[in-house]
Amino acid sequence: MSNMNQTIMDAFHFRHATKQFDPQKKVSKEDFETILESGRLSPSSLGLEPWKFVVIQDQALRDELKAHSWGAAKQLDTASHFVLIFARKNVTSRSPYVQHMLRDIKKYEAQTIPAVEQKFDAFQADFHISDNDQALYDWSSKQTYIALGNMMTTAALLGIDSCPMEGFSLDTVTDILANKGILDTEQFGLSVMVAFGYRQQDPPKNKTRQAYEDVIEWVGPKE
């Protein structure tokens, strides 16, 4: 195994869902910016980046969220950095956001955009993404988990712990964030939370996973 392969495997064995962080240890600005950049630079379906990363460092807000986030209470108290990942709503070919991405970010020439829109519509129809608003939002939310995974892997490579969380009252937390002007519910929904910091103690037992042959199947020669 090469040094790089070993480094990657070591990071995955190091990573675990840290329930309680050492509140005295803070992630450096440089390291945390690298974690955020790994999220921002993550791949997404059609390259549309249907996400927003909101870093919650205000302790009063963390305390308010804690009362409605049963799966994140200890992390909200102790994490060095706490991130909410929003998923964008209404990502359709002719929505203002997609038009902005095509014209201003990807710099498509005007005459090529109708063909791109047609391919976009066909893709969403084939995958039943455009069937209803919930399917459309779920598709965006899936993309946020790509960024989430990359952020946690980057953290592990830097020797930083993390914990992804879905254990919260979605409606109540959404209301709190919306009332504070943090979440525009017309444009976004809260997809997932993730905390970063340094573990208070090592996990009590080794990582457990199913066997390789139980979850991986090769069709054709194994090379």
UniProtKB/Swiss-Prot annotation:
The lineage of its organism: Bacteria, Bacillati, Bacillota, Bacilli, Bacillales. Its EC number is 1.-.-.-. GO terms for biological process: 2,4,6-trinitrotoluene catabolic process. Belongs to the nitroreductase family. One of its GO terms (cellular component) is cytosol. This is Putative NAD(P)H nitroreductase SAB2397c. Its cofactor is FMN. It is an enzyme of class 1 (oxidoreductase). It comes from Staphylococcus aureus (strain bovine RF122 / ET3-1). InterPro entries: NfsB-like, Nitroreductase, Nitroreductase-like, Nitroreductase/BluB.
